[in-house]
Amino acid sequence: MASGTHAHEKYWPVIEAFFDYYGLVGQHLDSFNRFVREELQQVVDSVGKLTPKIEGYVVELGDIEIGKPTIREADGSEHDLTPNEARIRNLTYASKLFLNMTPVRKEGSVSTRLETLKVYIGNMPIMLRSEKCHLHGKSDDDLIRMGDDPKDHGGYFIINGSERV
């Protein structure tokens, strides 16, 4: 039994190197980034177009756009929303989702594409330290200045001010 234990010791450097590189949340961040960067658009592309109840029209679905979290204040001003502010103010750390939509009018065999519209379709919670997070790529000094812990690797969401996995 003791020799079996020693045989496994040679694997620990590989395991430690994996966690040093990815951390405990690396897979969560990679998965979320892939979802935002590729898979969300693939869902839109698979739908392709909508047929409204208005005869002679279809709506072609285009690119989806996701920015970094912002907040609009009561006075109408808008600014970047940081995770720390979301926690303190009991807000959801989320980004606005926009979808480019092009109405197409069909009259007989003639189709006329109208002006493409950038349409707000909702908000999406943003995973902390993902590519869409304001903390992504920041130095330790910047993180401290923003009110966040440099040792916090992210991989979770802030919903109504509470951290959720």
Where are these regions (language model features)?
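Conserved N-terminal architectural modules of multi-subunit, DNA-dependent RNA polymerase core subunits
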Residues: 1-165
